A protein has these predicted regions:
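Residue-level signature of the cytosolic catalytic core of signaling kinases
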Residues: 131-134, 145, 206
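Acyl-thioester-dependent acyl-group transfer interface
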Residues: 1, 5-32, 139, 162-238
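Short, flexible turn/loop "capping" segments at secondary-structure junctions
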Residues: 34-37, 119-123, 133-134, 190-194
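Short amphipathic alpha-helices and their capping loops
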Residues: 1-10, 76-133, 178
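Short hydrophobic beta-strand segments that form the core of ligand-binding sensory/regulatory domains
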Residues: 42-44, 130, 199
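Non-catalytic N-terminal regions of enzymes
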Residues: 1-88, 138-143, 148-172
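Alpha-helical structural motif
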Residues: 15, 54, 58, 91, ...
Length: 238
């Protein structure tokens, strides 16, 4: 499915819309793009090549090499010091490696969730919303509520979406798909695509409070992130 290309990667100034097409049928191109805007480095990658973990590792190595070029005398540490890892380990198809025909599959029907609507950009372009959050304050709020930062932010986003729901659709649940790094559940060191997701949804009543949403999201995370459920969902992806 994937073939090696001896094509040099060229860094270019950012141009065009984010997440614009990388894969061009019948044309030999690389499935990733590196660009820059002022002091920001962008790395975009085709979803079949890697996931967020692999992309972040690549970007960190890229930045390290850039800093090494700019500051030759600097002694930068190894980012991922693992002498035992091989190229084959990093290219492993972990979905096939950890698929089990004996494990049960997890498929259940769910009520259609509320669909956000809005004005589309021309030519179906995408836009990016950047949000800077003070980590210490968020961590303190999450800790006080007895939840993780991920659970807290998930509940906050569900609550924010609820505020935009029209009255004629308040009976529909509000759902989010949360990515899950499967390397946390299987002993994989692959930098290839190896992630799944969980679906978190909440129903609202007239007296629903944010604390109720936090409690529901926390319980759903605990259930959906159990090893048995993750293994069943992995089999559905293969």
């Amino acid at each position: 499915y994937l073939e090696r290309r001896d094509i040099p990667a060229v860094v270019k100034k950012e141009a065009g819309a984010p997440c614009s097409g990388l894969y061009i049928p019948d044309k030999k191109t690389l499935l990733f793009r590196v660009s820059y805007y002022k002091n920001r480095i962008n790395f975009e990658v085709f979803h079949a090549l890697t996931d967020g973990t692999g992309a972040m590792h690549f970007l960190m190595e890229l930045v390290k090499n850039y800093l090494q070029e700019m500051h030759p005398s600097a002694e930068l540490p190894e980012l991922f010091p693992d002498e035992n890892i091989t190229g084959r380990d990093m290219e492993e198809d972990s979905f096939s490696q950890y698929y089990s025909s004996d494990a049960p599959r997890k498929r259940e029907s769910k009520k259609p969730a509320f669909q956000l609507k809005g004005e589309k950009l021309r030519q179906e372009d995408m836009s990016i919303t950047e949000v800077c959050i003070p980590v210490k304050e968020i961590h303190a709020r999450a800790k006080a509520a007895g939840v993780s930062i991920t659970v807290f932010l998930t509940a906050a986003l569900i609550w924010a979406i609820h505020e935009e729901v029209p009255q004629n659709q308040v009976k529909k649940p509000i759902g989010l798909m949360i990515p899950v790094n499967l390397r946390n559940y299987f002993p994989s060191r692959s930098m290839a695509n190896f992630f799944g997701w969980i679906e978190i949804s909440c129903y609202f009543q007239s007296d629903t409070a944010f604390e109720d949403i936090l409690k529901s999201v926390k319980e759903q995370f605990a259930k959906e992130l159990s090893k048995d459920v993750i293994e069943a969902k992995l089999n559905d992806l293969v």
